[in-house]
Regions:
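Basic, low-complexity intrinsically disordered segments
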Residues: 1-213
Length: 213
């Protein structure tokens, strides 16, 4: 299993790619994608940047050609024939590093572009148009909420305040998770999905340069 990460300042993108150890079903690969998105969101938070576009690429396993596959065929980097990969983008309503918003965008895009019948071998997810939190907030004229703002909820509209409150809660959780991982290791705290069968985060965290430590 290989894990590829990149932070491209010139193209303003942050992404990761994973080569699965074996062919995964659509649902099983979706679990891995959730883990990858969680890691991507934490990476955005750590770098203090936001994105307004999620890009997803899914490559299918060559074994699919032995079934009754009738779709387009392409060639992988090893010269093998494989079903044409699935690729798509999803724009967010505004610049964000919100796990909820990015997860929703990534999973809806996955459901839209992936053929559920085909087995999957590679996943790539990228956050595009990366800008600093400061620039993002300037662009969307975002103002940090204070306790006074919460008390004056009736003046701003309860729904708007609830959204801001959720954002603050999520950022606090991200900060706590990041601090724990830095202090005790990436496997010190794991999300529930990473304990399910087929999840790969724990194994990838145990690896250094693609090999187990």
């Amino acid at each position: 299993m290989k894990d590829i990460k990149s932070y491209e300042t010139e193209t303003k993108s942050i992404g990761s790619g994973q080569v699965l150890s074996c062919a995964y079903s659509c649902e099983k690969a979706k679990l891995v994608l959730k883990e990858m998105i969680n890691e991507l969101v934490l990476d955005l938070f750590e770098k203090m940047v936001m994105t307004d576009q999620i890009v997803l690429t899914v490559e299918y396993d060559t074994e699919n050609l032995k079934s009754n596959y009738k779709g387009e065929i392409s060639t992988d980097m090893y010269g093998r024939k494989i079903p044409k990969h699935a690729h798509g983008t999803r724009n967010l309503e505004e610049w964000s590093a919100s796990g909820k918003k990015i997860m929703k965008a990534g999973l809806s895009l996955y459901d839209e572009i992936v053929d559920p019948v085909l087995s999957i071998r590679k996943l790539y997810v990228t956050a595009n148009h990366i800008i600093s939190n400061t620039k993002a907030e300037e662009k969307k004229q975002y103002q940090q909420i204070s306790m006074f703002d919460l008390i004056q909820a009736e003046n701003e509209g309860q729904e708007k305040v609830d959204i801001k409150r959720d954002d603050i809660r999520e950022k606090n959780l991200q900060k706590a998770e990041l601090e724990i991982k830095k202090r005790f290791g990436k496997n010190a705290i794991m999300r529930g999905i990473s304990l399910e069968k087929g999840a790969t985060a724990k194994e990838r965290n145990d690896q250094i340069g693609g090999h187990k430590a």
